């Protein structure tokens, strides 16, 4: 099987890169092992939410993105943003904003500055882009609605309205609000309640999407809101897009917002579904449930890869993109004495002091502090080409969280790195 580009990994980075290449006429295949991290994400994308802390103290929140991305080069020279340069990072971020608008991902935000989004526990987290159905505030501006009702679903334990309501008013942007909490009684979900394992956001949305009792649900929301101007709901309404949520908003005449629940997350799944539909509609091929095993090299180039399901057939391509993610997606593997990338056996780097073969450098003694192993990943250059045995391979690129040299959890930049490197690599391949 021969392609122009073979992409390993079907998450945010892999799909974004594939779409950009397919739009320009390249023939791409994505080898997708299973659910990606985006399926468990909040739906909000972060470009850079916090600056690194050299003393493991509190990280400074980022508001002005350009200023802080530029400053990042001095503190983390191996960060993908530092290698690409602030100008290119912001340009690729803006390219993704345009792509998101084209795909109707319904995202709000800009590269000018971060906004605050409300979490499922009632705290605020910085974000670059958020679904327009999620409650957000800009800086210290007060939330525009004074009376808020936080409504859960009776018997659904992955969203706790009382806890959210109590925490919400502790934020300065919501201290003027009157926040109440309650539960929706939805009889159509009684069948799911018999098995707690099935009472999850995905199952709920699948049942409700048929709108068998849509008017009853509208009435229940209005009555439970008790005169509130805004209603916060768990993200359980609409599996593939926001149409169901929009219909509820129009019918109730209320400012309805949805909040991410415990994984799996509908907000993240919607984005992955829409990205995949776009990739396939452009003629891209998705090989689902398969995983890349190893590669064959010719000099400083990758000739082909082998996969688990296609044992007797090689996948050849002019260029290869490694978008396999970090430990969560098995893009990186840790054993007792080493951390490695399993397909190409690429060189591994991390933050200063990290050594992939010295387990004692992987962690620090305080559990809640940023851990050095979280910065592990493959080494790249300014073109995102992957390093192996000290040399950069000319037709192998890395995108997303498989890249090393930064801690995405600490800095709040995982999805930003994913889309920025994906679009940068697409440009590199198209320029050949």
Curated annotation (Swiss-Prot):
UniProt entry tagged with the keyword Oxidoreductase: yes
A biological process term (GO) from this entry: glycerol catabolic process
Reaction equation(s) it catalyzes: a quinone + sn-glycerol 3-phosphate = dihydroxyacetone phosphate + a quinol
EC number: 1.1.5.3
SUPFAM superfamilies hit by this protein: FAD/NAD(P)-binding domain (SSF51905)
One Gene Ontology CC term in the entry: glycerol-3-phosphate dehydrogenase (FAD) complex
InterPro entries named among the record's database cross-references: FAD-dep_OxRdtase_2_FAD-bd, FAD-oxidoreductase_2, FAD/NAD-bd_sf, G3P_DH_GlpB_su
Keywords: Flavoprotein, FMN, Oxidoreductase
Pathway in which this enzyme or protein is active: Polyol metabolism; glycerol degradation via glycerol kinase pathway; glycerone phosphate from sn-glycerol 3-phosphate (anaerobic route): step 1/1
Cofactor(s) it depends on: FMN
A molecular function (GO) term: glycerol-3-phosphate dehydrogenase (quinone) activity
Gene3D superfamilies: FAD/NAD(P)-binding domain
General function of this protein: Conversion of glycerol 3-phosphate to dihydroxyacetone. Uses fumarate or nitrate as electron acceptor.
Annotated HAMAP family: Glycerol3P_GlpB (MF_00753)
NCBIfam families: glycerol3P_GlpB, PRK05329.1-2, PRK05329.1-3, PRK05329.1-4
Subunit structure: Composed of a catalytic GlpA/B dimer and of membrane bound GlpC.
Family membership noted in the UniProt record: Belongs to the anaerobic G-3-P dehydrogenase subunit B family.
Protein name as catalogued: Anaerobic glycerol-3-phosphate dehydrogenase subunit B
Species of provenance: Haemophilus influenzae (strain 86-028NP)
């Amino acid at each position: 099987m021969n392609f122009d580009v073979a992409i390993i990994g079907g998450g945010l980075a892999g799909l974004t890169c594939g779409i950009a290449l397919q739009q320009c006429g390249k023939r791409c295949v994505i080898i997708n092992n299973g659910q990606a991290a985006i399926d468990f994400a909040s739906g909000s994308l972060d470009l850079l939410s916090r600056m690194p802390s050299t003393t493991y103290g509190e990280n400074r929140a980022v508001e002005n993105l350009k200023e802080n991305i530029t400053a990042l080069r001095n503190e983390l020279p191996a960060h993908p943003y530092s290698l690409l340069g602030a100008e290119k990072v912001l340009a690729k971020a803006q390219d993704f904003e345009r792509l998101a608008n084209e795909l109707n991902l319904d995202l709000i935000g800009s590269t000018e500055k971060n906004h605050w989004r409300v979490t499922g526990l009632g705290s605020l987290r910085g974000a670059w882009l958020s679904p327009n159905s999620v409650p957000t505030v800009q800086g210290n501006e007060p939330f525009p609605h004074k009376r808020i009702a936080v409504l859960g679903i009776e018997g659904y334990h992955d969203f706790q309205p009382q806890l959210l309501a109590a925490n919400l008013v502790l934020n300065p942007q919501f201290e003027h609000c009157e926040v109440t909490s309650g539960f929706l009684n939805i009889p159509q979900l009684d069948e799911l309640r018999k098995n707690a394992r099935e009472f999850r956001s995905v199952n709920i949305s699948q049942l409700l999407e048929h709108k068998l009792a849509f008017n009853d649900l509208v009435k229940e929301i209005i009555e439970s809101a008790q005169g509130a101007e805004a209603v916060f709901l768990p993200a359980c309404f609409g599996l593939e897009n926001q149409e169901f949520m929009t219909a509820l908003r129009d019918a109730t005449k209320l400012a309805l917002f949805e909040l991410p629940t415990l994984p799996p997350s509908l907000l993240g799944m919607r984005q992955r579904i829409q990205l995949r539909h776009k990739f396939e509609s452009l003629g891209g091929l998705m090989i689902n449930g398969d995983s890349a095993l190893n590669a064959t090299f010719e000099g400083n180039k990758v000739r082909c890869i082998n996969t688990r399901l296609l044992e007797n057939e090689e996948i050849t391509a002019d260029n290869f993109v490694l978008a396999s993610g970090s430990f969560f997606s098995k893009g990186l593997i840790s054993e007792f004495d080493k951390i490695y990338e399993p397909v190409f056996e690429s060189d591994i780097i991390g933050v200063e002091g990290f050594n992939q073969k010295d387990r004692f450098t992987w962690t620090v003694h305080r559990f809640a502090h940023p851990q050095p192993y979280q910065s592990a990943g493959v080494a790249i250059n300014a073109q995102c080409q992957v390093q192996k045995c000290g040399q950069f391979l000319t037709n192998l690129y890395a995108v997303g969280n498989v890249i090393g040299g930064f801690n995405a959890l600490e800095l709040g930049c995982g999805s930003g790195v994913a889309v920025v490197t994906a679009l940068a690599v697409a440009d590199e391949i198209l320029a050949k």
